Design a protein with these regions (language model features):
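N-terminal small-domain helix-loop-helix segment of the aminotransferase-like
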Residues: 2-104, 111, 295, 403-404
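Conserved core of the PLP fold type I
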Residues: 68-199, 216-217, 221-229, 233, ...
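PLP-dependent enzyme catalytic core of the Aspartate aminotransferase-like
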Residues: 234, 347-350, 357-404
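PLP-dependent aminotransferase class I/II
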Residues: 237-321, 327-331
């Protein structure tokens, strides 16, 4: 491969909660490991790979100038987004005026809700649910109504369209948050599924907030379908949210963006976000996006997805062979696997907290699935060198799931 996805980079002391926050965030971060075990971060959703070199190059080049005053986004910022969306997702007709900066995807979610629904109103969200949705939507004063995903006979997560319709009607819901690809389940929705969902939202006059931050992390054999692309109505009722952060490991720089084609919808969302003045772009995050959304970035992402596919294949095969009673739906996108440990816990007389604590004790920091509405689940991040995935599997085998 052209790019390095095998080096183990020491992140300690380099502003990374993935390694430095163990034992410091009760209920979220793993406990500190026992002496003799180094930390393998498999919890928070960032990667343990160096970003594409062009990101650093663009940041360094800008940082060599000694002034960082007020600024307007460069035309190149919009050009890179338009070209990236065209190349990666086949998006046509995207113009600079359709694009707006967001100081995080969750900020975009809340701004859209504030533009269209009243505090106390219900918002439809699928479950399992990304914990960030839960915290931000509820903190903003809205009531979440969950429509649970269902596993089909092949173990693939599916939307329950009848349940969606029923929940929308019963709760008089006019806003829905759609996660595509889905976190934490890793589902890449097919066109006909999105079409059917969007038709239901049309019938119930719902504004749709489509979180597509994972849209570049798509495993072989699958394709991301932008929600706005499935119909003209979907294009006009959807606020789509993107970022280079998940793709290029840039969460610490903060720099998301929205795509809104509907002028009225766009004006209302921007009016809300402008009132707080929170939504100002950071000059270095602008240059990071410009550096990421280059031809080299495309090559890097293609290689990354090959690496992630290999990691997921290894991990899932290991679970099948060694962890009897643990099940999962193989992800089609993202770098997360959502493990269902219900049967294992029942057979061994343990609970999910024991699995979390014992994993952390031997340096494997995976994430509690309960805040994602997985009652006996663990969310596992596989965006790290394969050698670390192998080491984590070995420790979990010897010291946790098959400890003697």
């Amino acid at each position: 491969m052209k790019y390095d996805f095998t080096s183990i980079i020491d992140r300690h002391g380099m502003d990374a909660i993935a390694v430095d926050s163990w034992g410091e965030i009760p209920g979220m971060a793993p406990n500190a490991p026992d002496e003799g075990f180094d930390r393998i971060p498999m919890w928070v959703a960032d990667m343990n790979f160096a970003t594409v070199p062009t990101v650093q190059e663009h940041i360094i080049q800008r940082a060599q100038h000694p002034m960082f005053g007020y600024f307007n986004p460069r035309p190149e910022y919009f050009d890179r987004i338009i070209e990236w969306q065209s190349r990666r997702n086949g998006v046509e007709g995207l113009l600079p005026e359709h694009i707006g900066y967001e100081n995080g995807v969750l900020g975009g979610v809340v701004s859209t809700l504030r533009a269209y629904v009243q505090p106390g109103d219900a918002v439809l969200v699928h479950s399992p649910t990304y914990i960030g949705f839960t915290k931000s939507i509820e903190a903003a004063g809205y009531r979440i109504v969950h429509s649970p995903l269902k596993l089909d006979d092949q173990g693939v997560w599916r939307m329950d369209f009848e349940d969606v319709e029923r929940k929308l009607a019963q709760n008089h819901i006019h806003a829905a948050v759609f996660c595509s690809p889905h976190n934490p389940c890793g589902r890449v929705w097919e066109r006909d599924e999105i079409e059917r969902a969007m038709d239901i939202y049309r019938q119930h006059d719902c504004v749709v907030i489509s979180d597509e931050i994972w849209s570049d992390i798509i495993l072989p054999g699958h394709k991301h379908i932008p929600t706005q692309s499935v119909s003209e109505d979907a294009r006009m009722r959807t606020v789509a949210l993107y970022a280079p952060s998940k793709t290029f490991n840039l969460a610490g720089l903060v720099g998301s963006y929205h795509i809104i084609y509907n002028e009225t919808l766009r004006d209302r969302v921007r009016t809300v976000s402008n009132k707080t003045h929170y939504n100002e772009m950071n000059v270095l995050s602008m240059h990071a996006l410009i550096g990421a959304y280059q031809s080299q970035g495309c090559e890097w992402v293609d290689e990354l997805n090959q690496v992630l596919a290999g990691n997921i294949e290894y991990f899932c095969n290991y679970v099948d062979e060694h962890f009897a009673g643990v099940s999962y739906s193989r992800p089609q996108g993202t770098y997360m696997v959502f493990l269902d440990c219900t049967e294992w816990c029942r057979e061994h007389g343990r609970d999910i907290q024991w699995l979390l604590d014992e994993g952390a004790r031997v340096g494997v920091g995976y994430q509690d699935g309960r805040p994602f509405h997985g009652p006996c689940h663990i969310r596992v991040n596989l965006a790290l060198p394969l050698s670390r995935v192998r080491e984590a599997c070995d420790r979990l085998d010897r010291y946790v799931f098959n400890a003697r």
